[in-house]
Amino acid sequence: MSTDIDNDVRTRWNVTALSAGHQIAMHSALLDMDLLLCGETGTGKDTLASRIHELSSRTGPFVGMNCAAIPESLAESQLFGVVNGAFTGVCRAREGYIEPSNGGTLYLDEIDTMPLSLQAKLLRVLESRGVERLGSTDFIPLDLQVIASASAPLDELVEQGLFRRDLFFRLNVLTLQLPALRKRREQILPLFDQFTQDIAAECGRSAPTLDNGRVQILLSHDWPGNVRELKSAANAICPRIAVAGRRAVEARDPVTGLRMQMRVIEKMLIQDALKRHRHNFDAVLEELELPRRTLYHRMKELGVASHIDLAAES
C-alpha cells in the first residue's frame, strides 16, 4: 500500500515543492489522519483528496461537500440532517451530507467559504466524530476521515475575523500546500503529455506530439487556472475533437496543421480568461499581456463571442 500511494502521488504531483508534501498525503491515507489541502483553484485538490481516499483502507464512501454551495438558511438541516417534525414542512427524518461518510471520507471542499455561524457546529462534529440531527439530541457516532480544502489562506482569514481560530487549529494538523502551476513550470510539459495520453487512450487514438511551436505556447502561458486549465488545453487539441477535414490537412501539410492547433489553444486561452474574469476586459488584458486592440483583433479572427461590440473597437 505504501509503495502504491507513494508512486501515485509522485506521478501526478512530481515536483520539488511536493517532495515532502507527497509524503504528507501518503501518511494521511496510511495512518487515517485528517488533512488540509491548500492551493489556488485548479491545483488538483479535489483529485488528490479522492485519490487519498481510494488508497486508504477505508471501505465507506467518499462524500464530497462543497461548502460554498450550501445555502446558509438551510445549512444545518443539509449538513446534519433532521428528524420528523423538527420544523414546519418536515414530514420525515432524513440524514444530512455528513452522515453518509460514516466508514469513509468526508471531503469539505472550499471550507474557507463556510459562514462563521456554521463553523462552530462543524468544529463540534470534527471533535466529537458524530452528529445530532436538527430537532434531536440523540448523538449519532461516525467513523470518518476528514479532508478539507481551501483556496484562500486560512491563517489570514483568521486574522481578518472570517474564520474561527479553533477550527483552523483543528484542521491544521496535517497541511499540504499545492503550488500553482506557474511556480512549477518544469511540470507543465509532463502533465500536459500525461493528459493527452490519457484522453487519446480513451478514444483509441494516438496523442499529438509536443512540437516546438506548441511547447513555446504552453511554457509561455502563466496558467492562472492551473492544472484544470492545462487539462482543458489538452482536451482542446486532443485527437478526439479533431474533425476529419483537419486531420486530412495535417496529413498533407504539417505546418498548416500546427497553425490550426495553435489557433485552437489561443482561442481556448482567451475564452477561459474571459469566463474567469466575467468579461472584464481590463483584467483579461492584464492577464494575457496584450494590447487592447490586439485582443479585439484576435477575438474577431478566432470567432470568440463577447459582451462587447468588437466591430466598434476594431
Curated annotation (Swiss-Prot):
Sigma-54 factor interaction domain residues: 11-239
DNA-binding region in chain numbering: 281-300
SMART domains, per the entry: AAA
CDD domains membership: AAA
Annotated transmembrane regions: none
UniProt-recorded Gene Ontology molecular function terms: ATP binding; ATP hydrolysis activity; sequence-specific DNA binding
SUPFAM superfamilies: Homeodomain-like, P-loop containing nucleoside triphosphate hydrolases
Residues noted as binding ATP in the record, renumbered to the chain: 39-46, 101-110
Keywords on record: Activator, ATP-binding, DNA-binding, Hypersensitive response elicitation, Nucleotide-binding, Transcription, Transcription regulation, Two-component regulatory system
Any one biological process term the GO annotation gives: regulation of DNA-templated transcription
Job of this protein: Member of the two-component regulatory system HrpR/HrpS that regulates the activation of the sigma factor hrpL which itself induces the expression of hprD as well as other hrp loci which are involved in plant pathogenicity, hrmA and avr genes. Probably interacts with sigma-54.
PANTHER family: C4-DICARBOXYLATE TRANSPORT TRANSCRIPTIONAL REGULATORY PROTEIN DCTD, TRANSCRIPTIONAL REGULATORY PROTEIN
Name assigned to this protein: Pathogenicity locus probable regulatory protein HrpR
Gene: hrpR
